[in-house]
Amino acid sequence: MGRAFEYRKAAKLKRWGHMAKTFTRLGKQIAIAVKAGGPEPENNPTLRSVIATCKRENMPKDNIERAIKNAMGKDQSDYKSMTYEGYGPHGIAVFVDTLTDNTTRTVADVRSVFNKFGGNLGTMGSLAFLFDHKCMFTFKIKDGMDMEELILDLIDYDVEDEYEQDDEEGTITIYGDPKSYAAIQKHLEECGFEDVGGDFTYIPNDLKEVTPEQRETLDKMIERLEEFDDVQTVYTNMKPEEGGNEE
């Protein structure tokens, strides 16, 4: 689906390449959802959405149930969503999305990586103009479904008319205004779509070319950032490698 599809296709496995870390990060999302809306998925739309994403990432049912149970414990940490942004090497914008129970630790970890690679960590919001903040929903394709009709129904929620279809997985991914997250999810569920997994993403509005050598350095920086458990996703405005095998 244009720039969003190009960017997400290249970044997908880099974000969720290590299964253990994937489950840790999803566990934090479960904790936040339970804290906000309770442990019952039928009464907590956000939790339903996170569980659908967990299933799509092959997170075992026992892990999901344990994460929900742990989230109700008195000793469960309170996670906070924080973003950190700045310029990495070669003038590439780097946007780091985190869930943390210790912002002092997290900002120190992130800053250390920026410094190591000759980057510069900026203030919150300093690079917001380089990325479009979107909500996204992935759901199973239904037999005989009319995507044009569905998109038309969702126009009032600022859903984009371009969408991403994965024939191998049998899923559709749509993008919309983050403020309309709950309304979009409700509409999709009322339409009978199954396993509606929702999330938020940042899509670069202009991709920058880099040389193979520059890409290697930037990939190392991204990998180093993603080693931290607090880091959920790292976004950049680096143009994906053509003909690469990231997915």
UniProtKB/Swiss-Prot annotation:
Record key words, sorted: Cytoplasm, DNA-binding, Transcription, Transcription regulation
Gene Ontology molecular function, alphabetical: DNA binding
Cellular compartments annotated: Cytoplasm
A Pfam family of this chain: TACO1_YebC_N
A cellular component term, taken from the record's GO annotations: cytosol
Cytoplasm found in the keyword field: yes
Keyword rRNA-binding listed: no
Main location: cytoplasm
Domain of life per record: Bacteria
GO biological process assignments: regulation of DNA-templated transcription
SUPFAM superfamilies cross-referenced by the UniProt entry: YebC-like
Disulphide bond pairs: none
PANTHER family associated with the record: TRANSCRIPTIONAL REGULATORY PROTEIN YEBC-RELATED, TRANSLATIONAL ACTIVATOR OF CYTOCHROME C OXIDASE 1
Family according to the record: Belongs to the TACO1 family.
Protein name listed in UniProt: Probable transcriptional regulatory protein BT_0627
The organism of origin for this protein: Bacteroides thetaiotaomicron (strain ATCC 29148 / DSM 2079 / JCM 5827 / CCUG 10774 / NCTC 10582 / VPI-5482 / E50)
